[in-house]
Amino acid sequence: MSLKLGVIGAGAIGKEHIRRCTQVLQGATVVAVSDINADNARAAVALPGVQAEVYADGHDVINASDVDAILVTSWDPTHEEYTLAAIAAGKPVFCEKPLAMTAEGCRRIVDAEMKAGRRLVQVGFMRPYDEGYLALKKVIDDGDIGAPLMLRCAHRNQSVGENYTTDMAITNTLIHELDVLRWLLNDDYRSVQVRFPRSTSHTHARLKDPQIVSFETKKGTLIDVEVFVNCQYGYDIQCEVVGETGIARLPEPSAVQMRKSASLSTAILTDWKDRFIKAYDVELQAFINDVKAGQLHGPSAWDGYAASVAADACIKAQGTSEPVEVTLPECPAFYKR
């Protein structure tokens, strides 16, 4: 039986998820769509194969009798509101990152979900579903390079618009590393420090770019993440793990190597959707399967909360040259099942 999905938010990622659920994945049908811009919603339901009703409001989607589960892909500041409403309605909800705009907002979602008595929330962190990250985690978990001592990572975007500000390098960009590195290392952050090198000429007045974000984990691993969102040359994700007995690197995306015109070259992707397109597919298929099976297993509301606690510390660290403590409470037993 097909799982009936309601999608709140039909912008870039929402429209892509509607296409994905309709044309690529199995076991789900999009039956309801809303967006603050009605043209976005109408464009989404006009995609080949989509047969969904357009609603004026996200709450109407949540309360629709024919909707079994919710995808929240709306404007970031609305995520908490719609996720809480889905929990109150007893409907499983896949919420794109960030789960909420603050750690306090994420904690409200955690508390509401625990009060509901079962996991209803999956956060849209797709990197744990990426083949490269899964392979890298297996190397670490199997002890092939010994205990992880240091990580060197980079999150580079070709360019961003003038509405992108210094704090968004944390809340919209680094947020993925904040989640996936906890998962990769099975560890939490102890402290964070942010440094600003010489700024690129391709940035604007409200954005300091690049940034170097340095963490110490509770097990003592040191992590440096370069966030450079106007790198010009492409979309580039790097992760190198230095262990006691060896070094492991995140594999590069598969690409044809060319020898031409006295040069040796390999193309670099420019679109984040292309870099993790398979991971997005696997992530949403897992959500669909888990909802139908009655038990969610993907990134939880607690994972969203943990990433937000770290993000808040990073933003605080942007305003000082000193390390800032990352204070994450003990994970409740509810999320350790």
Swiss-Prot record:
Q: Please verify whether the record's keywords include Nuclease.
A: no
Listed InterPro entries? Gfo-Idh-MocA_inositol_DH (IPR050424), Gfo/Idh/MocA-like_OxRdtase_C (IPR004104), Gfo/Idh/MocA-like_OxRdtase_N (IPR000683), MI/DCI_dehydrogenase (IPR023794), NAD(P)-bd_dom_sf (IPR036291)
Q: Which reaction does it catalyse?
A: myo-inositol + NAD(+) = scyllo-inosose + NADH + H(+)
Keywords recorded for this protein, A-Z:
NAD, Oxidoreductase
Taxonomic superkingdom? Bacteria
Tell me one Pfam family matched here: GFO_IDH_MocA_C
Q: Name one GO molecular function term.
A: inositol 2-dehydrogenase (NAD+) activity
Work out whether the entry's keyword set contains Oxidoreductase.
yes
Q: What is its EC number?
A: 1.1.1.18
Name one process (GO BP) from the record: inositol catabolic process
**Family, similarity comment:** Belongs to the Gfo/Idh/MocA family.
Query: What does the UniProt record say this protein does?
Result: Involved in the oxidation of myo-inositol (MI) to 2-keto-myo-inositol (2KMI or 2-inosose).
- Subunit composition and interactions: Homotetramer.
Annotated HAMAP family: IolG
Protein name, entry field: Inositol 2-dehydrogenase
Source organism per entry reads Klebsiella pneumoniae subsp. pneumoniae (strain ATCC 700721 / MGH 78578)
Q: Which gene encodes it?
A: iolG
